[in-house]
Amino acid sequence: MTPSEFRQSVRRGAFRGPTAGHCGPFAQANLAILPDAYAHDFLRFCQANPKACPLLGVGEPGAFRIDALGDDLDIRTDVPSYNVYRDGRLTERVESLDALWRDDFVVFAIGCSFSFEDMLAREGIGLRHVEEGRNVPMYRTSIANRRAGIFGGQLVVSMRPLRGADAIRAVQITSRFPGVHGAPIHIGDPRELGIEDLNAPEFGDAVTIRDGELPVFWACGVTPQTALMDAKLPIAIAHTPGYMLMTDITNASLAVF
């Protein structure tokens, strides 16, 4: 299935699940959507936190398309699930933004680690959340983001359990793709990130960690949602964690070496 066909299936309601493992050679994107009045500070926030918030594209006020992401793409309908935040609280999850769209909304598309999973799989590195049919586990850490204006919050990380040799190989592979979070930020003891229980992720689903495996943590594009909550904007919208926007950008084009 091409990215365009995948987006069409989401648009007509045929697909509503997590997007990991779909359209493997193509990049997926996290979303943050907020009023134009706050967009400059949010852009500065992304630039100050590039590991967690690598920008793939920024829209014009009111625009629900970003040409660099896909020719027939519609931000309002092409994500399986959206989170709506009001005054810093998650108030609802919706499957379309048609009823909520405003002429002053600015879209930020941020790289997603699902993008490099295809390369890991091609190297024979198993991905437990895909194997178990679950959403990837994501955790809010105790690490503060670099603040920009009203935006702060804490770093969020995704976790994939890997054997030692696979973890080393994963570092080598993902280092080539800083536009989708790049190399892991931590391998091993989750308490060093302020994570007390790997079986209780704040976002996504817990996965099995087998004997001899290490938890490997990548900076995650859910991080902006902690910033949106921290800022307590009257309204802000994001993808539901794990339910991403499929783009026409090839993963190969994002490699820096």
From Swiss-Prot:
Top-level taxonomic group: Bacteria
Instruction: Identify its protein family.
Output: Belongs to the D-glutamate cyclase family.
Molecular-function GO term, any one: lyase activity
Q: What is this protein called?
A: Putative hydro-lyase Bcenmc03_3969
Pfam families, per the entry: D-Glu_cyclase (PF07286)
Q: Which NCBIfam families match?
A: PRK05463.1 (NF003969)
Q: Which HAMAP family match?
A: Hydro_lyase
Instruction: Please give the InterPro entries that the UniProt record associates with this protein.
Output: D-Glu_cyclase, Putative_hydro-lyase, UPF0317
Naturally occurring in which organism (per UniProt): Burkholderia orbicola (strain MC0-3)
